[in-house]
Amino acid sequence: MSATGSTQRRLTVADILSMHADGERLPMLTAYDYPTARILDDAGIPMLLVGDSLGQVLLGYDSTVRVTMTEMLHHTAAVVRGSKRALVIGDMPFLSYASIDDALANAGRFLREAGATAVKIEGGVRSARTIEALVRAGVPVMGHIGWTPQSQHGMGGKVRVQGKSRETARALLADAIAIQEAGAFSMVVELVPEQLAATITSRLRIPTIGIGAGAGCSGQVQVITDVLGLGDFSPRHARKYADLQGAIRTAAEAWTADVRMGSFPGPAETVRMDEQTLDEVLGRTAQDRASGEATDADRAGMGLHAGIPLDRDL
């Protein structure tokens, strides 16, 4: 039975590598919260990446550079709680692996505190020693080459395809080999020409997960908000499979209209209490109720002095 057929336990790195060896294409989506993780897990997505992209698509930051370890751990833990089967990968944020000691400490927090199975690290040759140290310490690592958003300022600041020249293409090949030899179990290949990404994939034993890198990779990853149509901008490499932004707006407008018209809440959304109990609370008789006359308790403020709480939390 394929690893994808098991729903009784969480997938492992060994399962992902087995799927790759069997020729299965590997889908991966980003997830940032409990309900989304639960839905994606139920849909059979084998890998969920808690990407630092959450800084832009969830928290409103202008780049991923501002995302902190505290934020990443918070969201990774939510995704782990929401999923039962998917392998959850925590994205190491900017400067959290600036030194090997930092990398070991922070990657350990992803596994120990948040419950992730693996971490993702950007960079090729320059990150190889860090990846090797993490793998030796027992931390599964997913690499990331091509366009690496955390390095955007050092790469000119503008999002652009990487590896279009002879020199940069050769450098990416070297990056990929270095990551594999350092012990990573897979790598993201982002914004790389299709032919180069396919060549990199063919030269590796480990799976490549492409984003904006063509169909020749071992698998694909997308940012969940792009797939669901949440946001005003959709990158060229994304395909929108739903329009949740429109659906949410329509639902919010309909609910607002119902509130203003007084049709929400209706009987189906309302709880009533026993009239006899209400009579006792208000200090009235059934005859008072039938006649519609106000009692002394009504005039005194519905008997609020009798212990009806005014400060209850919503």
Regions found by a protein language model. Give the residues of each.
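Alpha/beta enzyme core
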Residues: 2-242, 246-275, 279-280, 284-314
